[in-house]
Amino acid sequence: MSFRGGNRGSRGGFRGNSRGGFGGRAAPQGPPDSVLEMGAFLHPCEGDIVCRSINTKIPYFNAPIYLENKTQVGKVDEILGPLNEVFFTVKCSDGVKAESFSEGDKFYIAPDKLLPIERFLPKPKVAGPPKPKRKRSGAPGGRGGFGGGRGGARGGSRGGFGGGRGGSRGGFGGSRGGFSGGRGGFSGGSRGGSRGGSRGGFGGSRGGSRGGFGGGRRF
């Protein structure tokens, strides 16, 4: 991740902080009591000075930049590059031309206009206490039990009911079987004895009974 991206994100914060903290339109202050080396001139760019940082700290945005004799030449405008190789640009003050400097010329800054580079590094994550695990035996178990109940109820009741149906149908079938057996017995008896007998000796009786039964049906 380039320092430019990180700085542009923090630039809003720094600009807001520096302008708010230092007043923005406050009366201009005189040169600082002391200055530190901040950067070395690389080349001009669209009227601005491009410098390579030679300080281990990061300058404030809009921080005044001086010569060694504490003459102000401009203010920090942009900060560029990765954290291990920082560059910055200087917006020149009125009457100062970027083309008037040579490569290697040094620029200075007040000590109170610097930030430690640690401010721009990601903070390590602090491991907190482990979160207690929720016991999942309550509700899901209840649902499982309820499901078992449903399974038991459905299986038992339907199974029992099905058995009942099977039993009743079986019984009914038995009854039908018994009835059929009865019919078989009756049929066998009647056909064996009665029917044979009727054909032999009760032929008139059969005709009479059928005639009588037919008469009964007419009523």
From Swiss-Prot:
It holds the Pfam family Gar1. GO terms for biological process: snoRNA guided rRNA pseudouridine synthesis. Keywords: Nucleus, Repeat, Ribonucleoprotein, Ribosome biogenesis, RNA-binding, rRNA processing. It comes from the Eukaryota. Coiled coil: none annotated. Residues 143-212 are annotated as: RGG-box 2. SUPFAM superfamilies: Translation proteins (SSF50447). Residues 1-24, 139-219 have a biased composition (Gly residues). GO terms for cellular component: box H/ACA snoRNP complex. Disulfide bonds: none annotated. Residues 4-24 are annotated as: RGG-box 1. Residues 1-29, 120-219 are annotated as: Disordered. Its main location: nucleus. Non-catalytic component of the H/ACA small nucleolar ribonucleoprotein (H/ACA snoRNP), which catalyzes pseudouridylation of rRNA and is required for ribosome biogenesis. This involves the isomerization of uridine such that the ribose is subsequently attached to C5, instead of the normal N1. Pseudouridine ('psi') residues may serve to stabilize the conformation of rRNAs. The H/ACA snoRNP complex also mediates pseudouridylation of other types of RNAs. The H/ACA snoRNP complex mediates pseudouridylation at position 93 in U2 snRNA. Component of the small nucleolar ribonucleoprotein particles containing H/ACA-type snoRNAs (H/ACA snoRNPs). Belongs to the GAR1 family. This is H/ACA ribonucleoprotein complex subunit GAR1. It comes from Kluyveromyces lactis (strain ATCC 8585 / CBS 2359 / DSM 70799 / NBRC 1267 / NRRL Y-1140 / WM37). The gene is GAR1.
